[in-house]
């Protein structure tokens, strides 16, 4: 029998959270996802794992024992992109949090992870987040939350998401999301200058075909050319646009097989784009999962 922590995944999407927990050394033993496109992705990558399709009809007794429940309930009613139309937890989609909480109450896993858009924190003037935190607290969980951004975890994107970790009967949740001061303070003199790293990186990069998309490009200087687009050392770099000409790597996987004109883009595979848009930043999830493992050994073993 495996000694790995077991994970039950809800609102699984295409399995980004599941992958992050597997990368950290845990075992996913259950998934629940309603969209058929995402179900097909899950079946391809986790063919042996039980997959339920509708959380609203899911009975707690049908979920195998799991140490960790993970899931990001639908964000449409919470997202700032729907400003003026946000129904919050009263909405039919984001209101599925209550069903998730019901399953947590009945099965009482040691750990709970909730991922959602930052809009969860201020929806209904903060009342929706208060409901989420209070609900978990009343179920006996210690609750911690933090907004994390994918750009600080080695990915070339700004993807800010709110993460809520809850630990049953212990204060372990806070230790998962927040580092002790000693772990977060570094000796600046020990760091290599970024321009040195940039020079040394060239030989390690793989060969690839490229073509021109912008003349100025991204220079190694803090500012370069009339657009002033140099590399930044305080966050994600500037985005190349389509004016002029410079270098872009040709990759079938990165471009979904074809580079198109704006007229064609509207006819692309919307299911794939929607699934990617709803996905999580896996390195962030893996970081959280690894810290759950450490805290679990401390508080539950």
Language-model features, listed with the residues they occupy:
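Charged, glycine-enriched surface loops/patches
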Residues: 125-149, 167-170
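Class I SAM-dependent DNA methyltransferase catalytic core
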Residues: 145-152, 157-301
């Amino acid at each position: 029998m495996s000694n790995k922590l077991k994970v039950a995944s809800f609102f699984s999407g295409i399995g980004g959270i599941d992958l992050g927990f597997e990368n950290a050394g845990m075992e996913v033993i259950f998934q629940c996802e309603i969209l058929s496109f995402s179900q097909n992705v899950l079946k391809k990558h986790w063919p042996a794992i039980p997959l339920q399709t509708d959380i609203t009809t899911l009975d707690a007794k049908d979920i195998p024992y799991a140490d960790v429940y993970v899931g990001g309930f639908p964000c449409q009613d919470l997202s700032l992109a729907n400003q003026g139309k946000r129904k919050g937890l009263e909405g039919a989609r984001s209101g599925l949090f209550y069903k998730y909480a019901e399953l947590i109450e009945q099965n009482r896993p040691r750990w709970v992870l909730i991922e959602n858009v930052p809009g969860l924190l201020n929806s209904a003037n903060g009342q929706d987040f208060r409901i989420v935190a209070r609900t978990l607290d009343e179920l006996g969980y210690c609750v911690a939350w933090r907004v994390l951004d994918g750009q600080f975890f080695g990915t070339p994107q700004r993807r800010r998401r709110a993460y809520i970790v809850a630990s049953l009967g212990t204060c372990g949740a806070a230790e998962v999301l927040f580092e002790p001061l000693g772990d977060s303070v570094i000796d600046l003199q020990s760091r290599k200058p970024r321009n040195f790293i940039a020079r040394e990186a060239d030989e390690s990069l793989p060969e690839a075909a490229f073509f021109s998309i912008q003349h100025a490009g991204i220079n190694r200087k803090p500012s370069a050319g009339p657009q002033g687009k140099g590399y930044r050392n305080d966050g994600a770099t500037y985005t190349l646009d389509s004016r002029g000409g410079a270098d872009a790597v040709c990759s079938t996987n990165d471009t979904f097989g074809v580079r198109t004109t704006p007229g064609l883009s509207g006819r692309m595979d919307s299911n794939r784009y929607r699934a990617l848009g709803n996905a999580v930043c896996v390195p962030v999830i893996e970081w959280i999962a690894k810290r759950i493992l450490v805290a679990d050994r401390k508080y539950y073993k």
